[in-house]
């Protein structure tokens, strides 16, 4: 064992603890069983003209990582009053207070930590370096020495009034307002390695405010009992503002005992402010027409404005046309008893996207320091270029759908086929270095999307005491880059002669015309070089146990000519199966099963490169190649992954039991004796299990996703 410990470069403390049988389970110290508590109480009722609802709620969550906590209290008031027969007014208001002073344990350090260290010093204080060397710090250190304060408050309110006017007209005005406040304070103690002497602190104070107003005029009339017209006109306006002040300081003197409360005690203070504002407005006209409730037509036009776009194009106009045909109402299907509903839908329409920074189209100034004659002056310089022509991104789509209900609606569902084209994508385009600017917000390219969606719902059993229904959904999508920046390059033949031109790809971002926006173009890992292949491996600078890449053209070298299209990073197929079973009108069991298929991502664990292994540090367990274990997937320890760099792509396909729920509702005859109107107990589990070959994390989130059990009691008096 002494030789073994020397090879692993054990420190004296590790040798001592190993010989004494002292072992630290760091994962057990940083992970815990999470607990989520959610309580709510509400009162509702109505009078002859008024409906009201009042509720209070409290949430207390502790996550699976030690120190991960969240607290929130909520209150809500809803009122609706009929002032007269032609006027209704209402109010919906909510206030939420959230707190999270959580300082989480360092799970990354815990994963890498040697089990033969000490958590605490002899006097019971936290030990900064559990192994008395410069490896990772104690995973619990930040929880012991840092300080945090985080609070948010949000107030939302919506006030509305509705007028019923003559001739089928109604008018409704809704005013929405939201206020938000946030305090985010943190102190980093200098007890932690790498923190400046005295420690450092940050205080962020943030508030925001937004309002919107919606005015809607509606008209609905039916003529000759078969012609129905429904007209809607909407005018909207909105405004958003925020204010943020940030103070930082470090090198607290004489020490950091006052934490962020005494931020003025540091020796290098910095302050900054960031205030933002945006506005928008819009107009919408929509007309729905139906003939005998069998032939349906819809047309709409909307004009939206947004302050973040260039001065030349702040507005976008988007139109939609749709038609529907209830075929099941036709005479030739009236006698087909097993068809209850059959509707054909066809639509064409445009939508706009304004997802850009509030000042993306404007030239912005950045504050800088200028030193002249030894004196520090503040100055500003233009850090971005304006684009006066920046405009809305527009998606034009065509949709064909069928809705159906069969066998007394025991089987129902829909089928959707769609084809979309997005133009003028909002993107940052790289600028030439000579310009002095890195990028400029632009409208670029064209992206095509097409796919299908299927929904099937069935009532499998429907008796007096048993009802069982299921719903299955499936969707598939494919996208393709049709056009990028319009930069043309020459196309050469094998002899280097120009035979034409084509639009250039964006290799830096991995965007290639004719391919999906997230399609992977890279080398193909085909395993590991084996014994007996030394001479062949040497041609590529490798040896047995090193990763082996596919030499597509067999020229004895690996370069860009050997890259292949390997797959996409988004699923090609998504499926969901949900089931709901009710027994004797009191027992209910349901589940949701979800799966995503046809996608892949980087999983480089099989590379086993040198920097993953340092003395007794831990890592995710993997197999590795040796002459005695000549597996074809996992490389040797310290494998050569350079020239060129190697990425390994694994499928992220999975099937997940998303949710399972079981509940029992007590019979009213039993509980009414105790003046209880409804009593229900429930148990619920999220993320019950996952089936996947993806090893390193949750295949959907690429992180650790907890399994959550929820026990609930619902009481109505």
Sequence positions of predicted segments:
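Residues embedded in well-ordered regular secondary structure
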Residues: 1-66, 104-106, 141-149, 162-164, ...
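Exposed, low-structure sequence patches enriched in small/polar residues
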Residues: 286-290, 300, 344, 473, ...
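Extracellular/periplasmic, surface-exposed regions of secreted and cell-surface proteins
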Residues: 37, 72, 78-87, 92-97, ...
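Extracytoplasmic gating/loop element in the C-terminal half of outer-membrane beta-barrel translocons
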Residues: 13-17, 265, 306, 542-544, ...
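Predominantly transmembrane beta-strands of Gram-negative outer membrane beta-barrel pores used
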Residues: 30, 38-60, 64, 76-82, ...
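Intrinsically disordered, low-complexity polar segments
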Residues: 54, 113-114
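Glycine-rich, aromatic-lined ligand/substrate-binding cores of catalytic
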Residues: 569-602
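Conserved small-residue
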Residues: 1-19, 246, 442, 459-568, ...
């Amino acid at each position: 064992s002494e030789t073994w410990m020397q090879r692993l470069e054990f420190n004296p403390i590790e040798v001592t603890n190993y010989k004494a049988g002292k072992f630290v389970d760091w994962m057990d110290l940083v992970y815990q069983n999470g607990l989520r508590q959610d309580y709510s109480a509400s009162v509702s009722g109505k009078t002859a003209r008024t409906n009201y609802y009042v509720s209070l709620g409290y949430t207390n969550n502790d996550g699976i990582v030690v120190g991960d906590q969240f607290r929130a209290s909520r209150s809500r008031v809803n009122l609706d009053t009929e002032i007269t027969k032609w006027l209704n007014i209402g109010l919906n208001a909510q206030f939420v207070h959230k707190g999270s002073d959580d300082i989480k344990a360092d799970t990354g350090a815990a994963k890498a930590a040697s089990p033969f260290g000490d958590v605490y010093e002899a006097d019971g204080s936290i030990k900064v370096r559990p192994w008395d060397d410069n490896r990772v710090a104690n995973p619990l250190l930040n929880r012991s020495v840092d300080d945090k304060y985080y609070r948010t408050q949000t107030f939302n309110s919506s006030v509305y009034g509705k007028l019923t006017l003559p001739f089928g007209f109604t008018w409704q005005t809704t005013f929405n307002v939201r206020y938000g406040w946030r305090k985010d304070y943190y102190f980093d103690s200098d007890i932690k390695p790498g923190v400046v002497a005295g420690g450092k602190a940050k205080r962020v104070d943030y508030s925001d405010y937004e309002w919107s107003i919606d005015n809607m005029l509606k008209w609905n009339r039916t003529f000759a009992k078969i012609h129905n017209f429904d007209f809607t006109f909407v005018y909207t306006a909105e405004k958003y503002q925020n204010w943020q002040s940030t103070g930082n300081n470090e090198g607290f003197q004489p020490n950091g005992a006052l934490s962020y409360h005494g931020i003025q005690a540091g020796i290098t203070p910095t302050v900054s402010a960031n205030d933002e504002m945006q506005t928008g407005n819009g107009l919408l006209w929509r007309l729905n027409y139906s003939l005998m409730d069998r032939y349906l037509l819809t047309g709409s036009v909307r004009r939206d404005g947004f302050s973040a776009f260039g001065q030349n194009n702040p507005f976008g106009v988007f139109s939609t046309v749709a038609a529907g045909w209830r075929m099941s109402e036709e005479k030739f299907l009236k006698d087909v008893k097993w068809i209850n509903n059959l509707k054909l839908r066809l639509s064409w329409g445009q939508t706009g996207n304004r997802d850009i920074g509030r000042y993306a189209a404007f030239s912005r100034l950045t504050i800088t320091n200028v030193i002249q004659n030894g004196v520090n002056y503040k100055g500003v310089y233009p850090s971005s270029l304006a684009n006066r022509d920046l405009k809305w991104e527009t998606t034009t789509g065509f949709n064909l759908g069928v809705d159906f209900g069969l066998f007394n609606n025991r089987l129902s569902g829909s089928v959707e086929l769609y084809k979309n084209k997005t133009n003028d994508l909002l993107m940052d385009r790289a600028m030439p270095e000579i310009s002095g600017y890195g990028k400029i917000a632009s409208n670029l390219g064209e992206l095509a999307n097409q796919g299908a969606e299927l929904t099937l719902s069935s009532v499998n059993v429907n008796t007096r005491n048993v009802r069982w229904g299921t719903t299955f959904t499936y969707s598939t999508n494919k996208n393709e880059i049709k056009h990028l920046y319009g930069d043309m390059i020459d196309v050469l033949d094998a002899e280097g002669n120009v035979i034409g031109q084509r639009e250039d790809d964006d290799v830096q971002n991995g965007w290639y015309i004719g391919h999906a926006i997230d399609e992977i173009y890279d080398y193909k890992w085909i395993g590991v070089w084996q014994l007996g292949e030394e001479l062949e491996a040497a041609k590529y600078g490798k040896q047995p146990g090193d990763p082996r890449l596919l030499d597509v053209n067999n020229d004895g070298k690996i370069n860009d000519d050997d890259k292949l299209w390997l797959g996409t990073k988004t699923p090609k197929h998504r499926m969901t199966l949900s089931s709901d079973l009710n027994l004797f009108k009191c027992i209910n069991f349901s589940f949701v099963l979800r799966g995503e298929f046809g996608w892949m991502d980087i999983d480089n664990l099989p590379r086993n490169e040198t920097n993953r292994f340092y003395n007794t540090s831990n890592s995710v367990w993997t197999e590795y190649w040796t002459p005695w274990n000549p597996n074809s997937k996992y490389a040797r320890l310290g494998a050569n992954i350079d020239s060129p760099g190697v990425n390994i792509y694994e499928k992220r396909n999975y099937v997940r039991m998303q949710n399972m729920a079981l509940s029992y509702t007590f019979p009213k005859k039993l509980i009414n004796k105790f003046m209880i109107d409804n009593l229900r107990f429930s148990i619920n589990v999220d993320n019950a299990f996952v089936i996947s070959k993806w090893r390193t994390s949750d295949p959907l989130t690429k992180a650790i996703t907890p399994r959550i059990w929820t026990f609930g009691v619902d009481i109505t008096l």
